[in-house]
């Protein structure tokens, strides 16, 4: 409750000005579940302009949705006016938002009952839709009719399955049936928004459960590059998923589990940045090499420590070893390398040209690569004179 106490002064100030105010959303849910608390959000009957008048330190980030960020005790908090939403456009966003003075009207528009619990600054729960009971049963249940909620915003179906993965809850039967019926509406949602939810699913503690629900509800058939992948997804559930340190590792493990042969093509369908695609593919390539042999100096040098660490963690998950010492061994081997990259070589292409009468050409790059590998393998000291003598001894100059 300590973090809520820090934010309670906002609620107290709003109430002093004649407004209602409550803690709402995921932070209240996580408090009940006894999970780490994320962002703390506040809902109030005060209109955005009234909130800004009360709190001089504010940022008007989403006034059209009623949201003002209030900075209190050095922390930012989203303060949002109670609101209802009109008909939704394209199954993803309301055509308009109406501010109201009723907490119940605000809570009834939310996605799942576990997320529709409010809490006073004293810690008293306002549970109008049996959210606490759903949490006790570990069930994900929509507020009101599931068909209505998913037709309003189709992304809620992905959120529901994401919560299966992150919380270890199960889908309430009518909620699950509605996902099976309305899964096709997910095709109206921007891929980027789906990717965010799927990534949270992959990094969840109960990821296997989430993947199983993707299959059972057939929602996978509306996801990029997974339309015909029921067997591949079921194969992925046979692996023991670990809590990876990075999302790159989670995606690499997933692609390995489903046997994806064209990872770059797959990831482009999910609208990833070129850098992230490059990292994930690099991890997969390193895993392929790692399966063939232990790390050696050349493989580790060419891979680089950042990719190598991720690849080793994923490899340990694949073989179900989970040996943390293996990553430390990779780190020790890398730190023992004479050089960590080509920029640390004490010779340049210009040096090579000055030592010979040859004209510039491809031979310069080839020679630098030979020198680089010799240094990395410990066959050559990284000193300019030693390098020149080595080249002369090998008749390479």
From Swiss-Prot:
Something else known: A single active site specifically recognizes both ATP and CTP and is responsible for their addition.
Family the UniProt entry places it in: Belongs to the tRNA nucleotidyltransferase/poly(A) polymerase family. Bacterial CCA-adding enzyme type 3 subfamily.
Name of the protein this chain belongs to: CCA-adding enzyme
Binding annotation for CTP: 26, 29, 110, 153, 156, 159, 162
EC class of the enzyme, as a word: transferase
Superkingdom of source: Bacteria
Reaction(s) catalysed by this chain's protein: a tRNA precursor + 2 CTP + ATP = a tRNA with a 3' CCA end + 3 diphosphate; a tRNA with a 3' CCA end + 2 CTP + ATP = a tRNA with a 3' CCACCA end + 3 diphosphate
Organism: Bacillus mycoides (strain KBAB4)
Sorted UniProt keywords: ATP-binding, Magnesium, Metal-binding, Nucleotide-binding, Nucleotidyltransferase, RNA repair, RNA-binding, Transferase, tRNA processing
GO biological process, one term: tRNA 3'-terminal CCA addition
Annotated Mg(2+) binding sites: 39, 41
CDD domains: NT_ClassII-CCAase
Oligomeric form and interacting partners: Homodimer.
Entries under InterPro entries matching the protein: Bact_CCA-adding_enz_type3_sf, CCA-adding_enz_C, CCA-adding_enz_firmicutes, NT_sf, PolA_pol_head_dom, PolyA_RNA-bd
The protein's required cofactors: Mg(2+)
Gene Ontology MF: a single term: magnesium ion binding
One Pfam entry name: PolyA_pol
E.C. code: 2.7.7.72
Record-listed ATP binding positions: 26, 29, 110, 153, 156, 159, 162
Function: Catalyzes the addition and repair of the essential 3'-terminal CCA sequence in tRNAs without using a nucleic acid template. Adds these three nucleotides in the order of C, C, and A to the tRNA nucleotide-73, using CTP and ATP as substrates and producing inorganic pyrophosphate. tRNA 3'-terminal CCA addition is required both for tRNA processing and repair. Also involved in tRNA surveillance by mediating tandem CCA addition to generate a CCACCA at the 3' terminus of unstable tRNAs. While stable tRNAs receive only 3'-terminal CCA, unstable tRNAs are marked with CCACCA and rapidly degraded.
